[in-house]
Structures are given as C-alpha cells and as structure tokens.
Regions:
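Short glycine-rich phosphate-binding loop at a beta-alpha junction
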Residues: 55-67, 149
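Short, well-ordered alpha-helices that flank and scaffold nucleotide-derived cofactor binding pockets
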Residues: 47, 51, 77, 81, ...
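Conserved acidic residues
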Residues: 60, 118, 146
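PRPP-dependent phosphoribosyltransferase catalytic core
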Residues: 2-13, 137-175
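Gly/Ser/Thr-rich loops at beta-strand to alpha-helix junctions
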Residues: 35, 63-71, 127-130
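Short, glycine/charge-rich flexible loops or terminal/linker lids adjacent to PRPP-binding catalytic cores
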Residues: 74-133
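Short acidic, glycine/proline-enriched helix-loop-strand junctions
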Residues: 71-73, 79-86, 108, 158-174
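Active-site-facing substrate-recognition patch
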Residues: 1-58
C-alpha cells in the first residue's frame, strides 16, 4: 500500500530490521526506545485507532503489558502534543492467583492510572502478554476494553481481538 504519511514512512524504515529478525516482537524495544521511533510510534497508533473509529475520547486509557511501557508513554506524549488527555496503566505479570487483586496482600496487577470506570485500548506488542488474561483482569477492575492496537502485525492479537469482539489495528509496514 502506497502512503505519503511521514510517520508511517519513518516507521517502515525503522521497523525493517525488526521484521527481518526471527522474533520481531522481542526486539520491539529497539524501536520504541530510540529517539526517532518514540517520536513516531505514539502518533502511528493514535492515527490507526482513529482510522478504525476510535478517537481519543472514545477511550481515555491505554493498557499495556509491562514490557510495552515505552510504547504506552509514546502514545501519552503524542496525545499531549495534540492537546488531548490520555492515561496509561501497565499490566504486571501474575505472581499468584489469576485475579486483578491477588490474595490478602492486595498485590496489584496494574501499575499506573486507575482502571475503574475507564474506557481503554489494549496494546498487544509483547510476546510475553496474554490478551485474554489482561482483558479479564481489566474488566474485573471495572475497565471497558474497546480496541486492541499492535505496532507490529500480530496474528495472535488479531485473533484475540476478533474473539473478544473488539477493534484490532496494526500499521501496514510493507510497501
């Protein structure tokens, strides 16, 4: 697909080496923690969600696996640059029973902005993340998940979103 979007063109150039590797998701931080990558990644994801009829305002929270903190921060900064408010929270790996609040110690499964009463999109870029587990935990905490975005195309995330009945989007990184 031909594009003239400068953000997408930059992302395509930066992501090319990742896409050629055997496990591009494992190398995603090389992109999201670089100056150029961080500057475009948040804009790309916000634009993609808008193209799928999910504008900021339709959601006010990004939920990301712990390993995708840089990508969540990129979205916050991109939204702020547009004069919009967006918060994020990170999903922490389970340390015990699979619930949003674990056992008597009250161990939290999320770190960041509160989830209760929030409408959220889920970032699905970490090879270590289980979308169903995050969705269940977020729902248990009172959040409504309306979409799932992935910076790199991910068939598992696409299948998860379809099964959950939520929007899925990822950029077209090919020509």
């Amino acid at each position: 697909m031909t594009t003239h979007d400068p953000h997408l063109l930059t992302l395509r150039g930066l992501a090319a080496p990742l896409l050629e590797s055997p496990n591009p998701l494992a190398r995603l931080n090389e992109l999201t923690l670089s100056a150029q990558g961080a500057a475009v990644c948040g804009h790309i994801l916000i634009d993609l969600l808008e193209e799928h009829d999910l504008a900021i305002g339709d959601y006010d929270l990004v939920i990301a696996p712990e390993g995708d903190a840089a990508l969540a921060a990129a979205m916050i900064h991109a939204a702020g640059g547009r004069g919009l408010d967006l918060d994020a929270t990170l999903f922490l790996p389970a340390q015990g029973p699979a619930s949003a609040i674990n056992n008597a110690e009250g161990e939290r499964r999320f770190s960041g902005s509160p989830l209760s009463g929030r409408t959220a999109v889920l970032l699905a870029n970490s090879a270590l993340a289980d979308g169903e587990e995050i969705l269940a935990a977020a729902t248990e905490c009172g959040a409504q998940i309306v979409g799932c975005a992935s910076l790199l195309p991910d068939e598992a995330a696409r299948a998860f979103a379809a099964a959950a009945g939520i929007v899925y989007c990822s950029p077209a990184l090919g020509d």
